[in-house]
């Protein structure tokens, strides 16, 4: 079931907006200022009908010229107050919205990046980006303007209603009878708008996820000449989002129209009754004029509430989706009272009866009764066919996952007893697929250790045989590598990864096909660099290259999540079996 197809939780309606409070609370001074200026501007607006009443009652004659001058001078003063209060109110609420949005995005991003690897395996990056972008913007629109319009309309409605009662209790009573008729469609239509808003946002997230996947795989799309096909797929996704948006817009339009017709129809009926009272001389014309203006204010406020109600429902839908992300909890966390590794870290590893299956494949064992001891400073190569469990061993060492049975010990300490930053801080990883970020060459190498000096970065690049190609780029170490390292070859990206590991200078080194993208000449140089890097460190190597495997102190052969043989290159060849077969197919051929 996709996110778009998932039913919205029935218990969550406007309650989802409560999640906004922690992001608004730190900026309470802006909220107080906004409320003060809201009250001031609303009060100034409600004064205007009083002046109109006096003008109508006193009439336009030479004898009343002085009074009229005073009234209009007072009106100008009210207008000045209204202008200042409105501008200040807009400033406060808009700034409040921007700050709340920044806090929301910052905390949401910080929460998401701390989730475990399993979460990202079952999530689509494009949808996560949509929630960080589109959904938070919808919420910002509510905080920055929607709430302002809603509360201003509510204050004006209450104020105008109170003044209507004060002006003419009889006419106000007739008006009060029609209010329930107006509120019913607002509530009924509003719930439907919320559901349609959520569906629309889910469809947009699906389209964003599709675009993200396609653009990230642009070379493959072009190689298979799928530009038109992918464009049509994206077009279909956009049309689905448009259909959902069209339904939402239509529902909001009907809501606004129904409310305006009902309210203004009722007000017209009440004013007709007031006009009859004026003709019967039971009501002054000035009083009716004053009541008319207050009724118009109240009607406008009701219309404003009906208009913004759709925004409120849309933001509630967006906040539900954001709340789902905040509700996610990392399955892999640091213990409440972590143990500290003994210093210096030696790098002794012990895998004790490890049993593990991936959450997405619960019926298939990735490792089964896996036992292995690695001595400090030993280099161990893991070899075996695809799916044997080699990369799983590295993933468990990094605590991307925890085994369902057994335990892994580092220097006699269970990995689950260590704080995650401490564990991962003593490990350097050179992955098969190197992540290059949109930054400079120096920044990408410094990813291995943020506080490294320029001299240390330069030394790491030299050791990884990366200095030459970096120096040849325009800008050298300050050259931008482009998103995902599009300006680098596969071998250059791997050398950046090796430089990171060298810079990290960790006691435990994990090499996952670290030289798979290198040509023979570059590999020879890198092998020397890796050999220097491995000295004095416990190293786990996954490789199919003969040179890498041969220099290992021990080779561990895996198949089906189990260890089937161990030994040196020569002894395993002499034994025959799986390793000899792999060597014949991959090394000799």
Model segments located where?
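Transmembrane helices of ABC transporter permease
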Residues: 26, 30-40, 81, 145-199, ...
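Juxtamembrane helix-loop junctions of ABC transporter transmembrane domains
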Residues: 3-13, 36-37, 44-57, 78-125, ...
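Helix-loop-helix
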Residues: 64, 70, 163-177, 247, ...
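ABC-type nucleotide-binding domain
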Residues: 342-589
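An intracellular "coupling" helix at the cytosolic face of ABC transporter transmembrane type-1 domains
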Residues: 26-29, 117-118, 134-143, 147, ...
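Transmembrane helix-loop-helix hairpins at lipid-water interfaces of multipass membrane proteins
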Residues: 31-85, 92, 165-170, 268, ...
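Alpha-helical segments in transporter systems
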Residues: 18-21, 29-50, 54, 71, ...
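Membrane-integrated ABC transporters
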Residues: 1-46, 60-75, 89-93, 97, ...
